[in-house]
Amino acid sequence: MVLIAACILSKTGKLLVARQFVNDMMRSRLEGLVDAFPKLIGNEKEAATRQHTFVETDSVRYVYHPLDNIYLVLVTTKNSNILEDLETLRLFVRVIPEYCRSNEEKEILAHDFDLIFAFDEVVTLGYRESVNLAQIRTFTEMDSHEERVFMQIKEAQEKAAKQAMAEKAKELKRAQKEALSRGLKPSYQSSTGISSSSTPNAAAVSEPAAPRPSAPKGPIGGGKALKLGGKTNNEDDFLDTLRQQGQSIAPVQKASLSGGVSSLAAPISTAPRVKREVVHVRTEEKINTRVSRDGGLESGEVQATVTLSIGSPEFIPISIKMNNGSAAGTQLQVHPNLDKKEWQSSSTLKIKPNGKPYPVNSDVGILKWKMALSEEEQLPISFNCWPQESSDGVQVNIEYTLQREDITLNNVRIIVPLPTATAPSVGECDGEYEYHKTKNVIVWSLAVIDSSNSSGTLEFSVPNGHCDHFFPVSVGFTSENLFVPITVQKVVKNDGSPVTYSVETTFNSENFEIV
């Protein structure tokens, strides 16, 4: 097909919006084609009642659709495919209500540029693009998740700077009152030019002028703190402030604010901190997976790192006996400074003879593993997302099933995107839910998922939208149970005497999506 132009005309023949898609046609020629259209349909009695119809001249074809007080007209070549033209016309008809509340002439003129931008997403150089209505809306909005995160951090920084200034002012007032109560002149008050010998008690008795609040020292609210991707000393304070305001954001990576997991789905651990002994072993395990909405695993991988921290030199010559419960397909790798033969024969982590000793008070990686997932049944939790379109809107049902009952999931959050400016009506929810209007998402939260609540459901409906609006679904959780059960059995010195040690294990979802 070759689509020459798309036009919106009033029933009286007035041209409201026109978008030309070919470059080899003069404006006067296009205006002549558009002006001829009302005359061609003027004698057709059924023109106002037909759903889809067309008229032809010697050179072009007009495919049009009547909409209340307007006509939507596509001007095409005569050799174009009429079926494709009608399909394109139907998409154009669906575009207009997305940007205009009615089909009145005033409303069309008020959103003419919005319609032109949308038309450009449908047709390029006279040929139809493979897009749907949701994609057109996304492309024209040009929404940026990174920009939203940056603005949130910027607002938090400004608020933190104001709080710091207020605290500094209070501190200065307290120091002023304490100095007055002791009968001393505050050290921060500037000299008035009067000799202290001439009026010895004036400075001590008179009420000093209120000090001007000075800008807080350090990087609080400084220009460099707003640098995108920059690392500042107060970064953790700003992120903590965000969390106190109810926002959950992922750690800001250097040189980029974008990540595979949305800020709301970033795992937050509320597990009590382990009392650290002189010998401390920490295992951190993460899962990355993409699951198809129709079922089946697109990609999946579990990665883990075991680190060792020793607080005293006398405990450096130690051996760590591990319970190796790794499944088939798990790739394990020990540190090059450790004895691989000891690991292969007895699952013991021990420094090689004449090897470099462990550093003191420093986390050192000693073991890591990676496991590729090939089936959805291997995941610790699975989801069934089922949006159903109807004349009243879209009914969405989401069900989770805990597949590994030996793993207890904490702080589980399922983030479901929603159509723009659409509030959900929740019918059933196991756990809690929260609607974030600014982010256009509904967050389904469960404090704990274990064998006692191994399945649950969230049901809600929205008045508009379609199935693609509710994907991808992001999932965040944390757990103290490892996916690959490789744990510490005992820690002993080289002479065989036992060593008191502490263990810390975490299993988090780094990027868990249903697409």
Curated annotation (Swiss-Prot):
Gene3D superfamilies for the chain: 3.30.450.60, Mu homology domain, subdomain B
Q: Does the keyword Ribosomal protein apply?
A: no
Low complexity bias (residue ranges): 187-198
- Listed Pfam families: Adap_comp_sub, Clat_adaptor_s
Compartments annotated for it: namely: Cytoplasm; Golgi apparatus membrane; Cytoplasmic vesicle, COPI-coated vesicle membrane
Q: Which GO terms describe its biological process?
A: endoplasmic reticulum to Golgi vesicle-mediated transport; Golgi localization; protein transport; retrograde vesicle-mediated transport, Golgi to endoplasmic reticulum
Q: Where is the composition biased (Basic and acidic residues)?
A: 161-180
Which residue ranges does the record assign to the MHD domain? Answer: 276-515
Q: Which UniProt keywords apply?
A: Cytoplasm, Cytoplasmic vesicle, ER-Golgi transport, Golgi apparatus, Membrane, Protein transport, Transport
Q: Where does the sequence pass through the membrane?
A: none
Matching InterPro entries, A to Z?
AP2_Mu_C_sf, AP_mu_sigma_su, Coatomer_dsu, Longin-like_dom_sf, MHD
In terms of superkingdom, the source organism counts as Eukaryota
Annotated membrane topology is: Peripheral membrane protein
Main localization of the protein described in the UniProt heading: cytoplasm
Q: Which GO terms describe its cellular component?
A: COPI vesicle coat; Golgi membrane
- State the residue spans of region: Disordered: 161-231
Q: How does it assemble?
A: Oligomeric complex that consists of at least the alpha, beta, beta', gamma, delta, epsilon and zeta subunits.
**What the protein does?**
The coatomer is a cytosolic protein complex that binds to dilysine motifs and reversibly associates with Golgi non-clathrin-coated vesicles, which further mediate biosynthetic protein transport from the ER, via the Golgi up to the trans Golgi network. Coatomer complex is required for budding from Golgi membranes, and is essential for the retrograde Golgi-to-ER transport of dilysine-tagged proteins.
User: What family, per the record?
Assistant: Belongs to the adaptor complexes medium subunit family. Delta-COP subfamily.
Q: Give the protein name, as stated in the record.
A: Probable coatomer subunit delta
